[in-house]
């Protein structure tokens, strides 16, 4: 269990740093290019899962279609994240995005009439207070973004982590109907051993097809995929072009590594795995952002990020 947990946590934390370095504010479509790279590597791993983990190949096309609503929620949330990180600090966006567990609990309470223990409710309140406060005390960042990008883009940028949180929460909520119980799942022909892998494979192949659609869009827009910038007229060799996109490629590779290991970590580790994955990824990205990206928030923001972390850990422990 610990090997999978450590690999998944580190991989996703490192991926966040490469996302920031690869999604450049001056490169208009960098977030879409990142989406293409992630989809490509996800597609490769999906084929590995499809042929090695006992997924029913005959029924998979039907399960692929059935799982589309969930997969699209997850994928679009990630595109929002890629766009937002072009303009805001990774240290700020990641804790917000990883707070979706609180929103999932609220959705379950409203639509499934689930009840929660007092500590679980307290954890939701802690996360909510932290989220509101960390964005409220982002005055310096707001002013900087407004002066640099304009008021409209500054608002859109800070909204992106919240869009990720919302869409990821909706996807996780819908996932309950697919992967929570093999006897009531909307998927067909799955067992306890294959239900998670079937859903995971459907998500990854959807990401691959989504990335192809994005690539077609970029082609229609006449965007040169490997250009240094949208207006670049310079001629570069193939390997130079690949090297220029190294941060996006590395982000996609580490994202896929995290995706490849987290299911095994969760299946073996239960609640403690959820705590480490949720909190560990944020802590890793915070530390790496400070070291490699030289990001520095105010002490008030770090305080409220710490409060969010406490809420996330409590939520994982008490069953959110």
Where in this protein do the model-derived segments appear?
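Membrane-interface helix-cap regions at the ends of transmembrane helices
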Residues: 42-62, 110, 133-145, 208-244, ...
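Alpha-helical transmembrane segments of compact multi-pass small-molecule transporters, enriched
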Residues: 41-45, 96-110, 206-209, 258-261, ...
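Structural motif at transmembrane-helix junctions in multi-pass transporters
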Residues: 25-31, 80-96, 183-184, 197, ...
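Transmembrane alpha-helices of multi-pass small-molecule transport proteins
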Residues: 7-18, 27-76, 126, 197-227, ...
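Loop-to-transmembrane-helix transition segments
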Residues: 1-8, 37, 50, 56-80, ...
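Hydrophobic transmembrane alpha-helices of multi-pass small-molecule transport proteins
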Residues: 46, 107-108, 118-139, 300-319
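Hydrophobic/aromatic residues within transmembrane alpha-helices
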Residues: 22, 34, 84, 110-116, ...
């Amino acid at each position: 269990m610990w090997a999978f947990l450590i690999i998944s946590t580190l991989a996703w934390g490192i991926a966040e740093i490469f996302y920031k370095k690869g999604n450049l504010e001056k490169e208009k479509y960098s977030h879409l290019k990142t989406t293409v790279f992630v989809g490509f590597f996800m597609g490769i791993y999906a084929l590995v899962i499809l042929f090695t983990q006992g997924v029913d190949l005959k029924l998979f096309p039907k399960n692929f279609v059935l799982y589309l609503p969930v997969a699209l929620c997850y994928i679009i949330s990630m595109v929002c994240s890629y766009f937002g990180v072009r303009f805001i600090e990774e240290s700020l966006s990641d804790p917000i995005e990883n707070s979706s567990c609180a929103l999932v609990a609220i959705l379950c309470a409203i639509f499934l009439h689930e009840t929660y223990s007092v500590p679980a409710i307290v954890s939701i309140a802690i996360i909510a207070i932290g989220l509101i406060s960390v964005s409220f005390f982002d005055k310096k960042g707001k002013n900087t973004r407004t002066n640099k990008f304009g008021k409209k883009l500054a608002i859109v940028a800070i909204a992106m982590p919240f869009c990720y949180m919302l869409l990821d929460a909706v996807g996780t909520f819908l996932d309950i109907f697919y992967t929570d119980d093999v006897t009531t799942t909307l998927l067909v022909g799955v067992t306890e051993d294959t239900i998670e892998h079937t859903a995971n494979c459907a998500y990854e192949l959807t990401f691959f097809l989504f990335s192809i659609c994005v690539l077609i869009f970029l082609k229609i827009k006449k965007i040169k995929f490997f250009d240094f910038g949208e207006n670049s007229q310079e001629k570069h060799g193939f390997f130079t072009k690949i090297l220029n996109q190294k941060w996006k490629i590395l982000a996609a590779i580490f994202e896929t590594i995290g995706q490849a290991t987290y299911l095994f970590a969760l299946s073996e580790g239960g609640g403690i795995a959820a705590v480490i994955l949720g909190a560990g990824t944020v802590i890793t990205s915070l530390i790496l952002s400070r070291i490699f990206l030289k990001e520095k928030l105010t002490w008030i923001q770090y305080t409220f990020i710490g409060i969010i972390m406490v809420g996330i850990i409590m939520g994982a422990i008490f069953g959110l």
